């Protein structure tokens, strides 16, 4: 198989038709792998992502047969840089996985695994992967125990014992009464009674969000949800609210959200957000919230029953409760599927060869710069050096590493970074200024003079350049020239005089010439 790597939204946009064709052909595909949902999600997440795309051979006219969406996260910790490869949908999707034509899976999935194995990462998080056992074996067989530690992630919530690796779902017939007949007598009677109570009464009503009401209905839902879970998720609540609001809003505008609200008079007492996937004809219950002070009929059961009835009327074939085996879900006639969560780690616990993936460079630079600002110089230095191992002429890493080295007194090493920087960015005045400063710190005044003159040439209106040149000339015993330059600067014709000083290049004497030869 030939594998391409898709890394930009425009490239992904061009693949929409190809993606949808593969998605439609794949019985294992689900909404979190749909082009609409994934494109929206990838447009919003920080950090690099990429999609492995497989085709039979390297032919521009040949469509892809499989896609594997992934993302990269990098951390500077324990005196090194560690990269994690994660499933692209993690932190927003209940399910992750691979989209693949069934006839291509035996070639495409092992090819994906081989490509991932060759990348520079310390940990591979195969988290919340909804995939058949057959495909799971094809994927994981390329990561043998001799080379990788494999750790199964425990998805059982300790507080209440809910197992988030178990995912209940109800298969929907084409008739509402047929669905009810498959439930227990008690549940069937309860659902009929509750829906009748709501629909035959002026006291209660259910509305479904429209373009005009969606924002208000969503805020109602999120407010209820926050009240319920704030104490338990306090440290993450604000980010979860922001993420859920953004994802559901994007998805609604793509036609992927169904949001009914249950009302008692003019008081909203519960709301439920479901992701709908017309291509696969599935409803996927995402989140709910209710007014905990409401003492009327059970709002959760009413909204689920209402949603399932509507899904059947629309011709949908599955109502998925997503992750978590909460007992109430099974009263709706559910089966369950199990998803996989495993972390694969290199035996060394580090990136192979200690190198970072080039896609991580912006993240590593940001983290290293923040560590540098906080005074954590050792970790910051590691970050800068890892960048330069991959991209030796990275201007920002050269500059910041040079500054860090100079600050800790390693002027010779700092000089090497700034000298490279002046070749990478010869038009950057700051690079010449920094090079001049470290040369001064090394006592190499003739060389410092040359760098400072170049700084003056690039920034003629900056007094710092004139001061630096004057200091070097004074150190070299050329006070007469400094005095002449000062007099020229205050004469009416000072502009041309300063230009003469700026363009002047001293001829090094024998001692400074030798010094320059040693320091180069």
PLM feature spans:
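Active-site/acyl-donor-binding loops of N-acyltransferases
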Residues: 72, 140-177, 317-366, 371
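A conserved beta-strand-loop-helix scaffold within acyl/acetyltransferase catalytic domains
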Residues: 2-85, 128-148, 154-295
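TPR alpha-solenoid repeat register
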Residues: 397, 431, 465, 498-499
């Amino acid at each position: 198989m030939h594998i391409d790597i898709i890394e930009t939204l425009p490239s992904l946009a061009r693949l929409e038709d190809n993606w949808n064709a593969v998605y439609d052909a794949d019985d294992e595909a689900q909404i979190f792998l749909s082009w609409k949902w994934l494109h929206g999600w990838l447009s919003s997440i920080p950090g690099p992502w990429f999609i492995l795309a497989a085709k039979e051979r390297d032919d521009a006219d040949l469509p892809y047969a499989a896609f594997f969406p992934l993302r990269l996260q990098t951390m500077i910790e324990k005196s090194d840089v560690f990269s994690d490869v994660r499933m692209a949908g993690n932190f927003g999707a209940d399910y992750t996985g691979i989209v693949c034509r069934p006839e291509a899976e035996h070639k495409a999935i092992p090819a994906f695994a081989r490509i991932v194995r060759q990348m520079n990462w310390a940990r591979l998080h195969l988290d919340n992967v909804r995939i058949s056992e057959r495909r799971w074996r094809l994927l994981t067989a390329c990561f043998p125990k001799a080379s990788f530690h494999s750790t199964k992630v425990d998805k059982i919530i300790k507080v209440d014992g809910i197992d988030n690796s178990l995912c209940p779902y109800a298969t929907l017939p084409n008739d509402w009464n047929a669905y009810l007949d498959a439930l227990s007598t008690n549940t069937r009677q309860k659902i009929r009674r509750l829906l009748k109570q709501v629909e035959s009464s002026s006291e209660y009503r259910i509305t479904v969000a429209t373009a005009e009401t969606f924002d208000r209905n969503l805020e109602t839902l999120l407010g209820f949800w926050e009240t319920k879970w704030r104490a338990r998720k306090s440290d993450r609540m604000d980010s979860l609210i922001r993420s859920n609001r953004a994802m559901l809003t994007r998805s609604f505008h793509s036609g992927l959200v169904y949001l009914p609200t249950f009302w008692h008079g003019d008081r909203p007492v519960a709301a439920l957000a479901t992701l709908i996937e017309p291509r696969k004809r599935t409803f996927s219950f995402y989140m709910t919230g209710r007014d905990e002070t409401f003492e009327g009929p059970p709002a959760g059961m009413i909204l689920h029953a209402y949603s399932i009835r509507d899904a059947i009327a629309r011709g949908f074939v599955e109502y998925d409760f997503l992750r978590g085996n909460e007992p109430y879900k099974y009263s709706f006639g559910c089966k369950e599927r199990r998803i996989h969560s495993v972390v694969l780690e290199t035996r060394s616990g580090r990136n192979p060869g200690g190198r970072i993936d080039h896609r991580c460079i912006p993240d590593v630079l940001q983290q290293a710069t923040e560590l540098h600002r906080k005074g954590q110089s050792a970790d910051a230095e590691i970050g800068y050096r890892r960048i330069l191992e991959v991209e030796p002429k990275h201007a920002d890493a050269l500059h910041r590493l040079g500054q860090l080295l100079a600050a800790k007194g390693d002027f010779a090493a700092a000089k090497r970074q700034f000298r490279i920087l002046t070749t990478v960015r010869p038009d950057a005045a700051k690079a010449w200024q920094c090079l001049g400063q470290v040369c001064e710190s090394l006592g190499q005044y003739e060389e410092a003079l040359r760098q400072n003159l170049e700084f003056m040439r690039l920034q003629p209106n900056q007094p710092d350049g004139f001061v630096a040149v004057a200091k070097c000339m004074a150190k070299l015993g050329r006070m007469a020239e400094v005095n002449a330059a000062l007099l020229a600067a205050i004469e009416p014709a000072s502009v041309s005089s300063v230009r003469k000083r700026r363009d002047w290049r001293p001829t090094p004497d024998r001692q400074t010439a030798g010094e320059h030869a040693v320091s180069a």
